[in-house]
Amino acid sequence: MITDEITLRLTQCFGHKPTDEQASAIRLFADFLVNRNPHSLMLMRGSAGTGKSSLAGVFVRALGLLGQKTVLMAPTGRAAKVFSLNSGGHAAFTIHRKIYRLRAFAGVGGEYNLNDNLHADTLFMVDEASMVANGSGAEAAFGSGRLLDDLVRYVYAGRNCRLVLIGDQAQLPPVGEEQSPALDTQFMQGYGMEVFACDLNEVVRQQSASGILFNATCLRQLMGRDEDTLLPRIRLEGFADLQIVPGDELIETLNTSYAEVGMDETIVVTRSNKRANVFNQGIRNTVLGREELLTTGDLLMVVKNNYHWTEKERSTIGFLANGDRARVMRVRNEQTAHGLRFADVWLQLTDYENEELQVTVVLDSLLSEAPALTAQQNEALYNNVLNDYADVPLKADRMKMVKNDAFFNALQVKFAYAVTCHKAQGGQWEHVFLDQGYVPEDSSRSDYLHWLYTAFTRAKSKLFLVNWPKNQVE
């Protein structure tokens, strides 16, 4: 009876007749809500164009009307912003900012403990869950080093709190993992959970005229087939939202996109940091006419977590996370120290209501072919800064000096006009320029299809295929 009432309320909030798959998902969500097992969670998996985001937004709005408390989270700032917009403006947080707190300074970086979950009777909903990793490595400074483990531990530590994970299994899995563990029913059952899972595969009718979604759906269907052909053929005919751009027309076409939809809604997606660097330099020099290494108006992406500047400025956003985007407002005091180049920069954080922050940036990371400064560079910087305070007698005082040193805490950034697909994941742009470059014949077919699908689905209204091979078009 209660399930029927909740199903009806959810359906009414939907605004139009749901598809059969969406109706099943609504019914399952109602079953989940009335389920009394405290160790239960829900997975809502759906590919591009199936109405997954719309359904999640309906759930959030309906839960508000039903008096159910909800917390929205996503892996990146941009994804959290999109989740919030799709949910009627309900606040959304990045997972790291919600579940971790800074514990201690520990040499090269800080250490973060798992936060206490002080919520009660709350449903935690995580969008873009395909990006939630569970391997150690880059996350070593955070909690146990395994994000998914920590997320589950955090949520279920709260009284009567449960979790809903929403995502697309066809997207790229987290770096170093073969699949997305957070969307895998068996994996999540391994936490001792009763799992309510639903899948949305049918592209909703109003989206069927989209070439982006038509080809994304074809790519998803290819993932389950054993075929010898590595490179799939893209259908262009009859679709206004797909366009091939030869290399000699790229500058003009990018210029047109910047004029039509703006720089914030245009991005180049490519396969490597090296190619992203080439595109970023080409765009800055040729399209934007910028000769300085860094100047007002430049778009940047944070490539290493940094808590120092937000703490210093008492910012509400907690810390600057890998993947956060920012616009340069002013650049001052360029200087060389410790074998690296630095500058004081005023940033506008475009994923966080355009909050402004003054930081010191290490300029060397802008052009590095590595994802950020290398471990050797970070270690050398730490040791050089430590040597600056060699005359301070007490070790504890020396460490405090290093902890507050502007050079040691310099923000590591790259230009954000062109990014790798992993960096673009979790965001969408009106216009996406896709450069796949050379694909070696011995490449993993599965990896390539997931990469291509993820890249295709970053585009909202138009996808430009840069220098696309003729043998990949039908």
Language-model features: locations:
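Conserved SAM-binding loop
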Residues: 18, 72, 268
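Short, conserved phosphate/pyrophosphate- and ester-handling motifs at nucleotide-, phospho-/glycolipid
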Residues: 22, 76, 272, 426
